Amino acid sequence: MSTSPAARPTSNAHLLGWVDEMAKLCKPDRVYWCDGSEAEKKRLTDDAVAAKVLIPLDQQKWPGCHYHHSNSSDVARVEHLTFICTPTKEQAGPTNNWMEPKEAYRKLGAIFDGSMKGRTMYVVPYVMGPSTSPFAKVGIEITDSVYVALNMGIMARMGKVALDRLGDSDEFNRGLHSVADCNPERRFICHFPQDNTIWSVGSGYGGNALLGKKCLALRIASYLAKNEGWLAEHMLILEAESPTGEKQYVAAAFPSACGKTNFAMMIPPAAFPGWKIRTVGDDISWMRVGEDGRLWAVNPENGYFGVAPGTNRKTNPNAMDSVRKDTIFTNVARTPDGDIWWEGMDHEAPAELIDWKGQPWKKGSTEKAAHPNSRFTAPAKNNPAISPLVDDPKGVPISAIIFGGRRSTTVPLVLEAFNWTHGVYLGSTMGSETTAAATGQVGVVRRDPMAMLPFIGYDCGSYLQHWLDMQSRIPNPPKIFLVNWFRKSAEGKFLWPGYGDNMRVLKWMLDRAAGRAPAKETLLGYTPGDSGLDLHGLDVSKDAIAAATQIDLGEWEQELESQSEWFEKLGKTLPRPLALQRELLLERVRAARKVK
């Protein structure tokens, strides 16, 4: 194994000792410390191209862009192989897979043993959050994947900046990753919250291998946030500027493939001249209480790891601009001359493609050319609508928190919670139909509290209690809303146009947060009523709007029955105030049905 003293760019004894220990376990041929420089990026990219890990795209059309296709069994997060390794099973809770920490270290240690023979061990220091922010957390990821090292260079503030922030401290996340033999039978993603450690083996896929993303920024961070009195959430952060120059900020939690990136990069419709939406973040929000008693948020990431299929100039022009240069595309389809394509792109598929498995594909094939969970990794700075406050160490003040799932029935277009506790109840009972972003059945409704079900690093009931406890810490809390862009007619057609027209719902929420919009009180919460939404210039029938905003009492009685099953699953740590909210709503629904 080769590494020279000059190649060790730190004197931090805690870090050096840990890296040596991991090298002894994994037995790489050489150890390389990443510095995050442009020169290094070029060198590692050249190495990846030489090793056929990356394929350069047409540099005229896609400057600085490359293509990667993963092992065909390694295309999504694997929730059944993702473990929370706490001292007791109760600390992990009923919604997480649990493994006893010593057993996990032993089991994975046997797979890591010698897993990097013949390979380079990359030491990837990174900071989540603006590097000078009190929010920031340092992580070190050790990996044998140059693809992972290059992706981390896009997704986080990577290299020297992280070592400078760390100094001589022992407070850093210890992340060990190896693709090993990419065997699904030997694939594990283990989180050790008490040790601030992540071990991931057997997968090169983003959510399993880019350890700063879901693993640190959500699973480990949610545990740290509970202990330290803040929130680590699966939320976009957007900036809305009105024609008068007023800026407001919202955080919104949607499960994977429910339009989070599209909402964060929304372009307001022509009927809203002068409005501007800018992106602070598209996926993760870390929120702390500021000196002014408001909730302030930063985006811990530095790039976008977005779903490609369905992204086009109509649905998300800012995302299309964000991927035009210096982007890594994974598991989309490509042409032999270095162009790319995916389902839902602006133009039809070319006559012939190379599909995501590397096989020839002809137009008219019943197989998907791009994998449904194919991705782009793009630098945030590419986004033409990025907020100038994206690197502000203070973060941005949050006026509204929005929860939203993908429901074809039951949940109306928008609701405002009566109060914080009611808002936590709405978030805790969110449901969404499953997507391709996690392996498993597609189209089944599952409860996904705050869109965090796969990402809570400890017991779910305790997590919901932490949300309730935050109320006493936030003197000036944001308002909480529930939205549903995906309601369908009896014929299966979407009732609401979505995309840029979601601005109409956002404007009402912003006006409510500022205390200047009327609302109608219903048994579910406050709604815009018949005249609250600005619908001018919208080509949608009154009947469709009425159906999208309707509250069907029969559906809600069924919904509350289903919520009861969900709450029973959470067991004895379910906060009593949330059970009470369900009981009170059930009484209101039954009373209203009797009146009818």
From Swiss-Prot:
Free-text function comment from the UniProt entry: Catalyzes the conversion of oxaloacetate (OAA) to phosphoenolpyruvate (PEP), the rate-limiting step in the metabolic pathway that produces glucose from lactate and other precursors derived from the citric acid cycle.
GO MF terms, alphabetically ordered: GTP binding; manganese ion binding; phosphoenolpyruvate carboxykinase (GTP) activity
The protein's name: Phosphoenolpyruvate carboxykinase [GTP]
Keywords recorded for this protein, A-Z: Cytoplasm, Decarboxylase, Gluconeogenesis, GTP-binding, Lyase, Manganese, Metal-binding, Nucleotide-binding
SUPFAM superfamilies, alphabetized: PEP carboxykinase N-terminal domain (SSF68923), PEP carboxykinase-like (SSF53795)
HAMAP family: PEPCK_GTP
Subunit structure: Monomer.
Entry-linked Gene3D superfamilies: 3.90.228.20, Phosphoenolpyruvate Carboxykinase, domain 1, Phosphoenolpyruvate Carboxykinase, domain 2
Protein family (similarity comment): Belongs to the phosphoenolpyruvate carboxykinase [GTP] family.
